[in-house]
Amino acid sequence: MHLAGHPRAAGVVLDNGEVIEADRVICNADLIYSYNNLLPPTSYATSLSKRKASCSSISFYWALNRQFPELSAHNIFLAEDYKESFDSIFKKHLIPEEPSFYVNVPSRVDPAAAPKGCDAVVVLVPVGHLLDSSSESHKGTPNTSGATQDWDTMVSIARETILKTIESRLKISLGEHIVHESVNTPPSWKDAFNLDRGAILGLSHSFFNVLSFRPKTSHPDISGLYFVGASTHPGTGVPIVLAGAKIVSEQILKSAHGSKVPWVENSAAVDEKNDSPLDRVQWLPMLNWIHWVIFLVLAVVASAFSAVSGGWD
């Protein structure tokens, strides 16, 4: 990151040393990676690395030499013992003995995704994230119970389980028709996209990672620097990340010499000739505060209930 003045984001520095200057910088890289690798070191950046992260995934990308109409565009295969499944992912950071998984067949909606008479298949298996953000090996590191994150072994387990589950539930055999396979694992997610601990959804939505606790879309100390993505406000998931991008675009427009935000101005347009200030609804800001207070109370109740239910095991 190229910084200037007091400090202010003034552009970016490329690997070859070239500086691309800018009035403002929007960073869509992984937020934790950005704070710890693209910006000056701070205690806040270090603390971000210690926050709870979301899950990762083992993802298969298969090219099949025939079509399987039994599979629709979107397919979800849930494990019967879902509690054990979640514990393996979020507590042990491993792959469940009976994993749940999602199957997408993009060629159902886009024929160009596969040759005629063939299918393209994407399988996503949620698994735990890397225990150590510095881990570079597919052999991983041991967790607190002593089990090792051996990703090569877990990939084999996942592939075998997926094929067996699909065959038993849909009575089709995919394995013999796979002509090409690519795989992503937590280490490869980390290496390819600099995702901290290989967590594909960034920071988790645990209590101290939501609402006012979640990293802001604008840097607290560096003016002109904004963040979008899963780990910044308001949260993770494509729709929520898009909402965060909308927030950033409004912040930038408002900071640009008071520029108007077109979609806000249009939606809030009123006929000044027939509408006096006394006629306008003034309590909408209060409703917004009430909304956040209710949301906070529900989050506290949910957190307390989760702690109590955990004691029933």
What spans do the regions from the language model cover?
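Terminal signal-anchor or tail-anchor transmembrane helices
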Residues: 282-313
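Active-site-proximal substrate-binding core of FAD-dependent oxidoreductases
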Residues: 3, 252-293
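C-terminal segments that line or cap access tunnels to active or ligand-binding sites in enzymes
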Residues: 63-187
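Mid-domain catalytic core of redox enzymes
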Residues: 1-115
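Hydrophobic, well-ordered secondary-structure elements that form the walls
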Residues: 26, 62, 123, 162, ...
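A generic secondary-structure signal for well-formed alpha-helical elements
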Residues: 29-33, 38, 42, 66, ...
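A conserved FAD-binding loop/helix module that cradles the flavin
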Residues: 230-253
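A glycine-rich dinucleotide-binding beta-alpha-beta segment and adjacent secondary-structure elements
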Residues: 98, 102, 163, 167-234
